[in-house]
Amino acid sequence: MSKGYELQVSELNLVSIPIFCMMLFMISQISWADEVEYVRIPSGHLQSNLNDPSGQSMGVLMAAFEMRSRPVTQQEFDSFLWAQPQWNKKQISPLMATSDYLADHDGAAEEVMTHVSWFAARAYCHYEHARLPTWFEWEYVAAADTWQKDARTDAGRNQGILTALQERLHRKGYVGQHLPNSYGIYDMNSLIWEWVEDFAAMFPQPDARDSSSAASLALCGGSALAFHDRGQFALMMRVAALSSLRPDQSSSFVGFRCVRSLEGSR
């Protein structure tokens, strides 16, 4: 074999290796998205803790849907950033994130993903063939404890949530460290606050945000700060936290999980 031919083969291999690696990564991402655990949440009725404009608690008929069993982790978000580099800190549009986006991000396998904007959370869920939950979907599942589908009147449970959130202030958050609720969903109340699709409904004033921004969603203007049960202090804290953020902002205590609609479900 001539040296010239050997050189061509060597150059070809150097070109082929990254292409081959890219193909392997793309295949792994397809299987990874399919393997993420989603749990079916049955249809039912939610008596929301949010009041309607007349001051009455809102009753909502919930269609069945699927919810991610755990919040998104840093490692999972790293895979998304690899596949969608426009969401990396150095490349993301300043309209989509502020300077603290991806702060303290080290890609840990079981550490919950925080410091992510609403825009980026939505993009991630789309990447996972899913979407962010609505507030009512989130509240519906979060009402459960390990044994009951609706444990919101349990004073001990509510105090336990507050205690867990206070302890979280002094440590990093790792997913799946406690028992799941009765639906099989982990970390709904005690680990982080979570983005929801219609978080703009948390604004107490209809003009609290620029009406031209993506925060002006269908439910914007509903006074979600009017709570039916003031004993739900942990839930009120969550609403207050989300209402204080713009969709481009992030926080060390706000992460997210995704849901999937079920075709034909009512």
Residue ranges, per PLM feature:
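Sec/Tat signal peptide C-region and signal peptidase I cleavage site
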Residues: I30-W32
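Short, P/G- and charge-enriched loop/turn segments at secondary-structure junctions
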Residues: D52-Q56, A241-P247
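A short glycine-rich, aromatic-capped structural motif
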Residues: D34-L95, H115-S117, S190
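Short, structured beta-strand segments at or near domain termini in extracellular proteins/domains
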Residues: S250-R266
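Bacterial N-terminal signal peptides
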Residues: S16-I27
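N-terminal secretory signal peptides that target proteins for export/translocation
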Residues: M1-L14
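Functional-site microenvironments in short loops/helix caps that host divalent-cation chemistry
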Residues: D100, D104-G107, T114-V239, P247
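Acidic glycine-/aspartate-rich tracts in secreted/extracellular proteins
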Residues: V72, D198-A200, E263-G264
